[in-house]
């Protein structure tokens, strides 16, 4: 059987806060995008290594212009976001800061988590650890998720049974470097940022998330995982509906504002997606990845929420563009497949004012740079 020929249709306007438009109305080449979606449809599913795509959404100038689903997925079906959830944790922390003066980037982790005072005999390095260190993964814990020997490694933490409270678990992990010196990818640190926001409010984090983020963003149903002690896990695997998942990218693109609601301060939103540390051959802000992508004869800066398997929200402020992806490229499947096809096939279809509307769309060569961290150092101004 040959897959059916794809025909583009404008996304439906629903009661979820998204205005919709056509590709043509927002200056995106429709034939090029039709070829791109057909390319996704035509991927053979004859191997465990075959890329499998579940959803592709595209927003231009704040309007949803493309919404496509594959392999039985739909807009009504929740999807695991894996580590892309870390970026949503950052949004929650920023929303708490915007709502309550008691939490700042300089708030001291152990003071907040201990009810206002430091624990007795606390490691001097831990005494200086701040919320900003958690958001940039530069806390200094021995917790590298790629190091099986690290006691704060996510798998080590989730496999152990002695401490059901994951906030308390990471607080007791030894230090590897002073806070702020080096960024190391560590899910437990992102989770602790969520716990710190809840502790500052003296509230269960999910109640605060619902009030400060979910309601103003008009999120539908969503699902958070809990640790064995019943705390929400801020390091990954929150499930969102596709049209809700992509809202987080638009929120950051619009400097923390969504449909009249200032959920984040403009300063926090801007710094969240600024390159602060080198991490995995790209750069990192406040639990958001930052990378420069080829576009025409220059590069454009993109910020990204990334999750294993191909989960992605990408915003490109210079093009007023947001992209959302769900996929199942786990294990031996091509993890970075969709990240590569965006600069190859999607960005060339995006027009700017003054472009020749009849010019052919030329695919762009691109190789994903994502890989092992060379140093984890600060980005120099």
PLM region spans:
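Carbohydrate-binding/catalytic loop surfaces
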Residues: 227-241, 289-291
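Structured C-terminal helix/loop/strand segments within mature extracytoplasmic catalytic/sensor domains
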Residues: 305-381
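Active-site SXXK
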Residues: 62, 80-106, 134, 193-197, ...
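Active-site-adjacent helix/loop patches that line small-molecule binding or acyl-intermediate pockets
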Residues: 108-114, 121-219, 242-256
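Active-site Gly/Thr loop motif
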Residues: 219-222, 270-324
């Amino acid at each position: 059987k040959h897959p059916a020929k794809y025909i583009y249709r404008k996304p439906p306007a629903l009661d979820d806060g998204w205005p919709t438009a056509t590709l043509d109305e927002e200056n995106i080449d429709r034939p090029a995008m039709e070829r791109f979606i057909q390319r996704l449809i035509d991927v053979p599913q004859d191997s465990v290594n075959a890329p499998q795509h579940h959803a592709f959404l595209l927003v231009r100038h704040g309007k949803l212009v493309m919404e496509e689903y594959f392999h039985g997925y739909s807009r009504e079906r929740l999807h695991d976001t894996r580590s892309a959830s870390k970026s949503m944790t950052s949004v929650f922390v920023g929303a708490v800061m915007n709502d309550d003066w008691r939490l700042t980037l300089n708030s001291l982790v152990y003071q907040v988590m201990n009810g206002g005072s430091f624990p007795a005999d606390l490691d001097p390095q831990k005494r200086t650890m701040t919320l900003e260190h958690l958001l940039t993964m530069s806390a200094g814990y021995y917790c590298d998720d790629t190091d099986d020997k690290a006691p704060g490694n996510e798998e080590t933490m989730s496999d152990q049974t002695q401490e059901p409270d994951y906030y308390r678990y990471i607080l007791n992990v030894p230090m590897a470097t002073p806070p702020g010196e080096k960024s190391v990818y560590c899910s437990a640190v992102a989770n602790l940022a969520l716990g710190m926001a809840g502790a500052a409010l003296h509230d269960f984090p999910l109640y605060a998330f619902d009030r400060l983020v979910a309601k103003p963003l008009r999120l539908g149903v969503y699902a958070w995982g809990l640790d064995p002690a019943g705390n929400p896990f801020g390091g990954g695997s929150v499930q969102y509906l596709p049209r809700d998942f992509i809202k987080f990218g638009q929120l950051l693109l619009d400097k923390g504002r969504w449909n009249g609601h200032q959920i984040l301060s403009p300063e926090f939103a801007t710094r969240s997606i600024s390159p602060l540390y080198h991490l995995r051959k790209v750069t990192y802000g406040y639990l958001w990845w930052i990378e420069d992508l080829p576009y025409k004869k220059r590069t454009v800066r993109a910020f990204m929420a990334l999750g294993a398997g191909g989960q992605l929200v990408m915003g490109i402020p210079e093009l007023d563009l947001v992209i959302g992806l769900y996929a199942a490229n786990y294990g031996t499947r091509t993890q970075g497949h969709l990240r590569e096809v965006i600069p190859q096939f999607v960005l060339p279809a995006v027009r700017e004012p003054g472009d020749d509307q009849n010019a052919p769309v030329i695919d762009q060569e691109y190789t994903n740079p994502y890989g092992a961290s060379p140093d984890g150092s600060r980005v120099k101004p």
